[in-house]
Amino acid sequence: MSVAGGVAGAELKPTRVIDTHTHFYDPTRLGGVPWPPKESKLLYRTVLPDDWAAVAGPQGVRETVVVEASPLVEDNQWVLDLAAKDARLIGVVGNLDPNDAGFEANVKRFAANPKFRGVRWRGGLVDIDKNPENVLRGAKVLAEHGLELDLNGSNAMLPHALKLAETVPDLRMVINHLGGSGDPAATKPGWDKGVAILARRCPNVYMKVSALVEQVPGAEGAAPRELAYYLPVLEHLWKEFGEDRLIYGSNWPVSDRGAPYEVVFGLVREFFAGKGEGAMEKYFWKNALVAYGVK
């Protein structure tokens, strides 16, 4: 089946959808933004909640958890200010470095806001295999505040994610972007085994089915629109994480590198509709309530 012309496939639709991975930013702000880079013709523009709603709303997606990509501490406040004025933004995953002397104070500061639901550590900015004492201390601080931890890039890989998840078992962790599977037609060596080990040994770890179309090499916006192309990755994640630990995230607007939002949503809707109504509801919103503590 194809979603090339929009959402297709089974008529089964989720009753609610929480998109747990969007990015909002405004390069025209005083001081600009450290991400995305000016060289990115696709991404370097003002991207705000109404822009997301214009593409997500027609698919029935009306709530999101925003992931802050900027490493600047005050940019966490900027996105929280957005969320304070917009009920569609039900949660924020911040960007705070455990190697920063002010990490614990900043966690305490932002955690006072009920929409602040966690922190993301992205490989290259925060490498969890370096400065292990700071990383472990930071992870425990997050757990103590009832927050979760998103991991992206090299951090999502074994053995680092596994060690952290087992050392701090009361910390909810969400692996971003399929754990960096690579092209579904030729996944990265060791990805399938790594995913299996992490899923089986760490019940506190969730997998975000996000950045699906961006894993495909090739021209911008030209990712395959046939569900069959992505099945090697999707079926493996389903086998290992099951219906209780898979979460929906679009990674918009970065997802436009692979395909429009309607295609991104349509692919996973078709896949999870095929797993039954209960599994689909868990994937699109119920699991997000548990992982992120949103309402």
Predicted regions and their residues:
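Catalytic pocket-lining loop regions of alpha/beta-barrel enzymes
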Residues: 128-247
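A structural signal for short coil/turn segments at secondary-structure junctions
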Residues: 59, 86-87, 114, 146, ...
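Short aromatic-enriched loop/helix-cap "lid" or pocket-rim segments at secondary-structure transitions
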Residues: 28-33, 105-106, 186-188, 219-221, ...
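Short, small-residue-enriched loops and turns at beta-alpha junctions
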Residues: 71-72, 98-101, 125-129, 181-184, ...
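Mid-to-C-terminal alpha-helical segments outside catalytic/metal-binding sites
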Residues: 1-20, 45-63, 235-236, 240-247, ...
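N-terminal cationic-hydrophobic initiation segments that often serve targeting/anchoring roles
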Residues: 56, 83-84, 111, 165-166, ...
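Mid-domain alpha/beta scaffold segments of enzyme catalytic cores
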Residues: 11-145, 151, 228, 267
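Active-site glycine-centered loops adjacent to acidic/histidine catalytic or metal-binding residues
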Residues: 251
